[in-house]
Amino acid sequence: VLEIPAMELIMPVYLGASDAHLAAGAAVLGNTSAPIGGDNTNCVIAGHRGWRGADYFRHIDRLAVGDSVTLTNLWGTLTYTVADIQIIQPHEVEKIKIQPNRDLLTLLTCHPYASGGRQRYVVYCEKLPTMSQSR
């Protein structure tokens, strides 16, 4: 489950970005990290920017650096902080690859809104080490 307070959003997250999964919520893109966190991971979660009356990632532009994003899986809840926001071209797949020594959650949607997907709006969220992990 993905929770983004700044967007007033709570939505399910499915494994695999099939049409059915994206119609029902957000989905982890194939060939990206599983939604379990850890060093050298980047879990990329895609969502429609509005779909058949549901907002989904419609208001992703409300997010700002420093905002909190949580992802709950079967083992617990991971809390991330928005670290960067970029607008990229659809072919720039290197921008969503794993970055060494970082634990990332990347949110991905079409941009601009209702444009048919000419570009991608990308929100990079990083899980910062807790005090016990940084010692």
Residue ranges and their predicted role:
Residues 1-135:
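Solvent-exposed, non-transmembrane regions of membrane-associated and secreted proteins
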